[in-house]
Amino acid sequence: MAEQQPTFQQAMEITAAWLQQWENEEISDEVLADRIGEMVSSRDGARGFFVVSLAGDSALMDRLPDAVVGQLRAAGSGVVDLSVRNLAMSTAMAVTHGRSGDSAQQAGSQRVSSRCSELLRQLEPALVKERLEQLLEATVDNTGADVAFLEKWGYDAEQRVAISKSVYDVADD
């Protein structure tokens, strides 16, 4: 009998518990990595994992253990896609928060964006390059598959410029 995949909400709750155990040194990098590998094998699981790990206070995404990087790389294009989308969304939200003068929220969005950039540098280079080029095509030329994504969230010209800059920043470092 196949294991039931977690819902998005369950994935967030499970991830938060795992990260707390990891922070408290109750589980090893390797055990955490195995659990993350299972979690990111489904779209909802991966979404829940990234919401908690990218936006939360855990240091995991700031100092990714090799075992975790290996599991995230092995997950392939699904993890790359979510990481690129999170890069775009957090970058656009940093612009929004900057406009409204909410420096705390802006800093949080910038932290997520930085974490996404660093993660993307450690994932499979060919997949990352292809996915970033697709996003760039939409932000710069308003063509390709990501135009609908940008329009869905209502990103304006300033946000699209910031997103394209964040794409180039991934490649520069």
For the regions a language model picked out, list residue spans one by one:
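Amphipathic alpha-helical elements of HEAT/ARM-like alpha-solenoid repeat scaffolds that form extended
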Residues: 11-17, 46-54, 89-93, 147
